[in-house]
Amino acid sequence: MHPRLSPTVRALNAAAAATLLLGLAAPLGAQGAVDPNVAPRAAELERIGERQLGTEMLGRYLAVAQSDGRAWFLLARFYRLDARDWHRSGHRTSPDAELYLALSDVAIEEAVKLEVDSAPLYGALVAVDRALVTIEEQGWSHLAGSDVLPPLPPMVLELGRNLVANCPSGGVILAGSELEGVAVWYGVMGPGGRSDLLPVRPDLYAIDGRYRSQTARALGVSDSLGIRPALAAASAARAVCLTPNADSTLVPDEQPRIERLVRIIGPGDVPANAGLGFTQLVLDQETGSSVWSRDVLSVYGVASRRNPLLCRSLASVAGVLPGGACRP
């Protein structure tokens, strides 16, 4: 569990948290048989707007069938969605995001133990979400050197380092997808990361007053500004960098300069040691070991279509880049 969780949440071990907060009617008992139909039924409930019923179904089921990794993973996803809804509601609902994310963490740890392919990356997403709660409560400066991040799949970790490598010192960086977002977060906040950069979530800035207030303070702008004027004001003094899939309409109407994977608005020079690495990407193409290969390749493909010079560095994987990138 995360070291900054409240004492009450830290005191709950996995079994107690599941029993108390999933609303299980039955105590944890003997291991039951895995039913492959439960997770799809719960997912369908969520699809039709009955996530709470799906959560209760999974809770009762996992109390007796604790070896179903897919069900644990789906339960983690449901609790993370509950935390997202808490932000969107203006923090007016109960429980709060901290508790939902603690429960998501419990569930994803079980999914990791059961070797669900996507679980490690999802655990990283939950860790980022916990950090966002800390930002809202205590500000960006509280994060410096204080986070212990769970492991990230090596190819995604490499992607994050590549995405942040060419953003000028002191810049702001915007991601365009969850994959890019978690990769950038690790590239900034992880060991040896670009801690001089500020990874901003435009979607959260638009809907969450607490996040907007703390992030506007870090940007040095008024929190009365929307995300686009806030970034325009910030870009007068610092670079604003966009990952390959980031929305270009969020930044001022000027032609960005392209530096390898990122587009840049505003001042600042690219760090002198800003090399890119593709060791994990190439290794994965040889072994086929990562379920995230297609998504990571898609990011590089988008960047290569915008910046054909990248194709030289990506020559060894050019044949598998999507959308015709790097092909004659």
Q: Could you describe each region identified by the protein language model?
A:
Residues 2-16:
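Bacterial N-terminal signal peptides that target proteins for export
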Residues 13-25:
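Bacterial N-terminal signal peptides
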Residues 26-30:
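Sec/Tat signal peptide C-region and signal peptidase I cleavage site
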Residues 31-170, 182, 187-328:
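ER/secretory pathway lumenal C-terminal domains and tails of membrane proteins involved
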